Regions:
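Intrinsically disordered, low-complexity, charge-rich terminal extensions
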Residues: 1-352
Length: 352
């Protein structure tokens, strides 16, 4: 029988936010501590007690799955006819999962490093996870990240020191692969298809855009071939109008705001403490009194989790130049710090 702690280990290996995992554990009334191993040590007794072990094991699996689906994602949403979504779900259930892939074999657990190094770069569908109102197709791939590490100046051997001299400090640069867990989520009742991408805090916008385009291509080509609908992702939601909605609505905390003025001023305001709201800052408030219209181009806002612990966040990122567009479009969201589907749906409702 699989050890339920393997699901927590998998989240740690994937470098999922420990803070978010800890909040999820609290929301399931499980014990926590100050780090991964200390927390595991506190959970082990719960898995040994006759009256708590089954509920604890089920909670660990659910936490893993919901964190994989919803924690720290780049999100793009498409309006699609509900009938077409149902047709697509039927077709994808039969033929979209790549059952022969190296990612599929041990899913949902990440590959060992030696396996990951040999794995192909392209994105494949490794599994289908169905929830009550949506079908999730789990997309796996690998991507390399570049890390810089400071090394002691005496790390060079004698020959290298002779060739290059003595250094006070050395910088080592290393590329390593990480396994990504992206999601294509089909919600027929809502008439929506969502693509949620992993790695929002690890990769730049260009890297993420390339991966988004590849998944869009895979879904569109599959839909064209299997249900005769070539442009199924043709209608993307525009989140630019939601910036004003988020700013004007009194709930939550606006932690960051980017805006421009009629006098060509460009401002990016950020509060030092997460509990402080940009809108209540005296400097910001004085500025809004002085300008006719606050022309915002980006915003980050968070709320207390409906589950009790955590602060799920929506960020609408954009360059200031979009504020001068005649018909501005932002089709990307960052949905951060969610510990569950409840958190994710709660914050997404704020922009839809």
């Amino acid at each position: 029988m699989l050890n339920p702690l393997s699901y927590i280990d998998a989240l740690q290996v994937r470098d999922v936010s420990f803070k978010s995992v800890r909040n999820a554990l609290k929301n399931h009334d499980l014990p926590v501590s100050t780090g991964w191993q200390q927390t595991v040590a506190k959970i082990i007794p719960e898995l040994k007690k006759k009256d708590t072990k089954d509920a604890c094991a089920a909670s660990l699996v659910l936490i893993h799955n919901e964190m994989t689906l919803y924690c720290d994602k780049v999100v793009k949403i498409y309006e699609v006819d509900a009938g077409l979504i149902n047709l697509l779900i039927g077709a994808m259930s039969k033929g979209f999962v790549d059952k022969g892939s190296v990612y599929t074999k041990g899913f949902p657990f990440p590959l060992a490093l030696d396996e990951l190094l040999k794995a192909p770069l392209d994105i494949i569908c490794a599994a289908q996870w169905d929830e009550k109102d949506r079908s999730n197709f789990m997309m796996c791939s690998k991507q390399y990240i570049t890390e810089r590490e400071e090394l002691p100046g005496d790390s060079l051997d004698d020959d290298a020191t002779k060739d290059f001299g003595v250094f006070d400090e050395l910088i080592g640069i290393r590329r390593r692969p990480i396994q990504l867990y992206d999601v294509v989520s089909l919600l027929p009742d809502e008439g929506l298809i969502e693509i949620r991408l992993d790695g929002v805090k690890k990769f730049n916008a260009d890297d993420i855009s390339r991966r988004m385009r590849r998944i869009e291509q895979l879904v569109s080509q599959f839909a064209a071939k299997n249900i005769g609908t070539p442009d199924i992702l043709g209608t993307k939601l525009n989140f630019y109008p939601a910036i004003k909605k988020l700013y004007d609505t009194n709930d939550g905390v606006v932690g960051e705001l980017g805006h421009v003025t009629d006098a060509a001023g460009i401002y990016r305001e950020k509060m030092r403490h997460k509990s402080r709201d940009v809108r209540l800052d005296p400097y910001h408030h004085g500025g809004t009194v002085a300008v006719v219209d606050l022309n915002a181009y980006s915003i980050s806002k968070h709320w207390p989790s409906p589950a009790g612990n955590g602060e799920p966040e929506i960020s609408i990122p954009a360059h200031f130049s979009i504020a001068s567009d005649k018909n501005p479009v932002i089709d990307i969201l960052h949905v951060l710090n969610c510990t569950s589907q409840e958190d994710y749906d709660f914050v997404l409702d704020k922009v839809l």
